[in-house]
């Protein structure tokens, strides 16, 4: 370790700053600058996506049963809107759950940053 730096004008050593010699094999990089922080998992968004997925699947099943006649409450005039709403609710839930699954498994190109987070 080198001695502390002296002020050239007064010749008084500065005790606040300590210098040390770098090793000859050091290339100026430290390991911490290459480490990634662990990803922040958006639990609220994944819970919402799960809810959308389940509600959408339920509405698609009910709409299909209404359309096929197993549930006889109005027929096709009620089945088509239920199917459309079920599909519109199911698709975003499925999409975000797929991203969350692939991000959790570490697939290339998928990360939790692709899922919108609701932590305001």
Curated annotation (Swiss-Prot):
Keywords: Cytoplasmic vesicle, Endosome, Golgi apparatus, Membrane, Phosphoprotein, Synapse, Transmembrane, Transmembrane helix. It comes from the Eukaryota. The modification Phosphoserine is found at residues 15, 23-24. The chain crosses the membrane at residues 46-66, 79-99. It is found in: Membrane; Golgi apparatus, trans-Golgi network; Cytoplasmic vesicle, Secretory vesicle, Synaptic vesicle; Early endosome. GO terms for biological process: synaptic vesicle transport. InterPro entries: TMEM230 (IPR044234), TMEM_230/134 (IPR008590). Its main location: membrane. One of its GO terms (cellular component) is synaptic vesicle. It is a multi-pass membrane protein. Pfam families: TMEM_230_134. Disulfide bonds: none annotated. Involved in trafficking and recycling of synaptic vesicles. Belongs to the TMEM134/TMEM230 family. This is Transmembrane protein 230. The lineage of its organism: Eukaryota, Metazoa, Chordata, Craniata, Vertebrata.
